[in-house]
Regions:
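Short helix-coil boundary/hinge micro-motifs
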Residues: 1-163
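Cys/His-clustered metal-coordination modules, chiefly Zn-binding fingers
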Residues: 129-207
């Protein structure tokens, strides 16, 4: 007798920024020492669990499952990181006004085809949410909300507002929702102030 392996999760619609937040889990990409937030599968699951739209899917990949299926767990993690890098390159192309590379476009489309399907809307405390059928033991299924976010960003008007931080060592991606469309920094308190301090140093230490 066969059993249905799929379960249903209730997931809110992901913000378009979610995919960029995922890409930004590797920080200081332009520096000599990039900072990796997702060094292990538990790191990935912990990050997903902190995202309201992905928490339910992250809970399906447990430590016990990873111990029982170590090769699948390693493959899932490697595929997730590869998807992160494809999303980052797509974002960088948008920020630069370039065409998204066909390899990255194909990788995103292939992952979307394997993502947990949205079966319809349900009512929840916030109003409405997606009913998602999932068996999240693949990177595409696990990252479904991130992938939907990336697809919505590429297909929507906000693709023209994707920027990369003007700090060449940072390279974080963000959607510029400022009225003037002139935001330069991922965070003014961090990269913006650092750039101001560097300019001040150069002005006051000219030989």
């Amino acid at each position: 007798m066969s059993t249905n392996q799929h379960r249903t999760a209730v997931i809110g619609a992901p913000a378009e920024d979610l995919c960029l937040d995922f890409a930004n889990t590797l920080s200081w990409r332009g520096s000599a020492t990039p900072s990796e937030s997702l060094a292990t599968l538990p790191d990935l699951l912990s990050w997903l669990a902190r995202q309201a739209q992905a928490e339910a899917l992250a809970a399906t990949v447990t430590a016990a499952w990873a111990e029982r299926h170590p090769k699948r767990a390693v493959r899932l993690f490697a595929e997730a990181i590869a998807l992160r890098e494809a999303v980052f390159r797509c974002g960088m192309a948008l920020a630069s006004g370039d065409i998204v590379a066909e390899t990255d476009f194909a990788a995103l489309n292939q992952a979307l085809a394997g993502a947990s399907p949205r079966r319809g809307l349900v009512r929840d405390a916030a109003g409405f949410a997606w009913a998602v059928e999932h068996e999240a033991h693949s990177a595409a299924a696990l990252l479904a909300p991130v992938l939907w976010s990336a697809a919505d960003l590429l297909a929507g008007a906000d693709r023209l507002r994707v920027r990369r931080c003007a700090n060449d060592e940072c390279l974080w991606l963000f959607v510029d929702r400022s009225k003037t469309g002139s935001r330069r920094w991922c965070d003014m308190a961090a990269c913006g102030n650092r750039a101001k301090a560097q300019r001040h140093y150069r002005r006051t230490h000219v030989s």
